[in-house]
Amino acid sequence: MGKEIKKVVLAYSGGLDTSVILKWIAKTYDCEVVTLTADLGQEEDLDGVDEKALRTGATRAYVEDLREEFARDFIFPMMRACAIYEGRYLLGTSIARPLITRRLVEIAHAEGAQAVAHGATGKGNDQVRFELASAALDPSLKVIAPWREWDFRSRTDLLNFAAENDIPVISAGNRKLYSMDRNMLHCSFEGGELEDPWNEPGPGSYIMAVPVEQAPDEPEYITIDFEKGNAVAINGQAMSPAAIIKTLNTLGGKHGVGRLDMVENRFVGMKSRGVYETPGGTVLHAAHRDLEGICLDREALHLRDSLIPRYAAAVYNGFWYSPEREALQALVDKTQENVTGTVRVKLYKGNVVPVGRKSPYSLYRMDLATFEEDEVYNQADAAGFIRLNSLRIQGYGRRS
């Protein structure tokens, strides 16, 4: 087992799990371990994480700022598609995995490694996402998933291994209440009291957004400018994709926007309960959707909308690097060519309320839509339209 693998590239956070994994792989496979720590805007202090990896046994430690790449090449394409899983989840965890895996594979090539490794458990979706992405990018690389191989079954087992191997960890008394995953788009919470779907999430699950009870009593109005479906400015100030997300996180989070508590269907077959905070993404999704209302032709909009579940499932299930997702993206991006304009949004007590929109490509005609007297639309013409559309269903209601 260990002879064929001489070097492994590990997705490394610096926490207990991946620190134990680093040492376990080095010992079990008798190989070199190179680590990758990706800054995806998770708001964690990554200073010293490379030194910790090296002290734990890594031969080289990469710490990379991938925030702009993450926002530009992964979040924004998904937002253009209005992707939302099971009608509710904005895919904050799912969309991060393809980028991390791509860098793992690229580093593996640069380092001459034979395998990549991750710390996802054998019960969740992330193992699938990492490994499908790796297979798509380089099927010759082996993927090591320690949670499916080793005998450890609890946090205590990991702590004991860490103590035996001089791996520095935080004390057990400081452990988090939940299993958490955070990046610039969202923060997710699972486990603990959340495993009972009847329990209300506790105060420890509020990191990016305040409880609505604590949100300001006055609404806040903002404007978001879009070009070809991508947000480019907030309140008239041009910003990079990552800065757009970060700014909207601050604005939305202050007003309690973007909280979601749901039971979802995992790709691996079980249901799981998760609590998600996606303040900036929720604001962006609502504003973009609203602008499409005046910019997109009806049939193009309806066609794209019919494909939202397919696109969202591709992201959720780990098929970012797939012919179907790329084909869907091509259709989506065609629809976005004229989604350019400005949306005015009101933020208040957990709500995102679009209250105004304008676009140089607007298909909305006030002279046609008016309820006042007009000289453009002959209302009598509607009679023939209705008559022709009734032919197919005439008498249908009498069949039963």
From Swiss-Prot:
Reactions catalysed, semicolon-separated, are: L-citrulline + L-aspartate + ATP = 2-(N(omega)-L-arginino)succinate + AMP + diphosphate + H(+)
Broad class of enzyme this protein falls into:
ligase
Give one Pfam hit by family name.
Arginosuc_syn_C
* PROSITE patterns from the UniProt entry: ARGININOSUCCIN_SYN_1, ARGININOSUCCIN_SYN_2
Keyword annotations for this protein, in alphabetical order, are:
Amino-acid biosynthesis, Arginine biosynthesis, ATP-binding, Cytoplasm, Ligase, Nucleotide-binding
Ligase found in the keyword field: yes
- Disulfide bridge positions per record: none
Q: What is its main location?
A: cytoplasm
- Identify the residues that bind ATP: A11, Y12, S13, G14, G15, L16, D17, T18, S19, A38, G119
- Could you tell me which NCBIfam families the record lists for this protein? argG, PRK00509.1
| Name by which UniProt lists this protein | Argininosuccinate synthase
Q: From which organism does this entry originate?
A: Oleidesulfovibrio alaskensis (strain ATCC BAA-1058 / DSM 17464 / G20)
The gene that this protein is the product of is argG
